């Protein structure tokens, strides 16, 4: 089956005797600091990625503002001149 609560308590007591409470406290605080640093690095990376995507979208918007999708048409005067030359 699984590990019971009594077995976990015995293992914890053995670890405390071997390493001592002060050393375990230091290990715990070091581990907590490492986890905190990792989370901060991940969130900073996400923010940088979001800023990059936002900047690219703004750039694409600015580039697309001056683009017109129209069909070229000739003026009536130009059409008649073209027909006269032919």
Curated annotation (Swiss-Prot):
Signal peptide: none
Membrane-spanning segments: 1-21
GO molecular function: protein transmembrane transporter activity
Nucleotide-binding keyword on record: no
InterPro entries, alphabetized: TatA/B/E, TatA/E
Membrane topology: Single-pass membrane protein
GO cellular component annotations of the record: TAT protein transport complex
GO biological process, one term: protein transport by the Tat complex
Taxonomic superkingdom: Bacteria
Main location: membrane
Localization in the cell: Cell inner membrane
Gene3D superfamilies with a match to the protein in the record: 1.20.5.3310
Presence of keyword Hydrolase: no
UniProtKB keywords: Cell inner membrane, Cell membrane, Membrane, Protein transport, Translocation, Transmembrane, Transmembrane helix, Transport
Subunit structure: The Tat system comprises two distinct complexes: a TatABC complex, containing multiple copies of TatA, TatB and TatC subunits, and a separate TatA complex, containing only TatA subunits. Substrates initially bind to the TatABC complex, which probably triggers association of the separate TatA complex to form the active translocon.
Protein family: Belongs to the TatA/E family.
Function field: Part of the twin-arginine translocation (Tat) system that transports large folded proteins containing a characteristic twin-arginine motif in their signal peptide across membranes. TatA could form the protein-conducting channel of the Tat system.
Name of the protein in question: Sec-independent protein translocase protein TatA
Organism for this UniProt entry: Hydrogenovibrio crunogenus (strain DSM 25203 / XCL-2) (Thiomicrospira crunogena)
């Amino acid at each position: 089956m699984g590990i019971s609560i009594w077995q976990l308590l015995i293992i914890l007591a053995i670890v405390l005797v071997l390493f001592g409470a002060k050393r375990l406290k230091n290990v715990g605080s070091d581990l907590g600091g490492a986890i905190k640093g990792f989370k901060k690095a991940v969130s900073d990376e996400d923010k940088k990625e979001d800023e990059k995507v936002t900047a690219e979208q703004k750039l694409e918007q600015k580039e697309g503002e001056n683009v017109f999708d129209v069909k070229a048409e000739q003026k009536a005067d130009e059409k008649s001149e073209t027909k006269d030359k032919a």
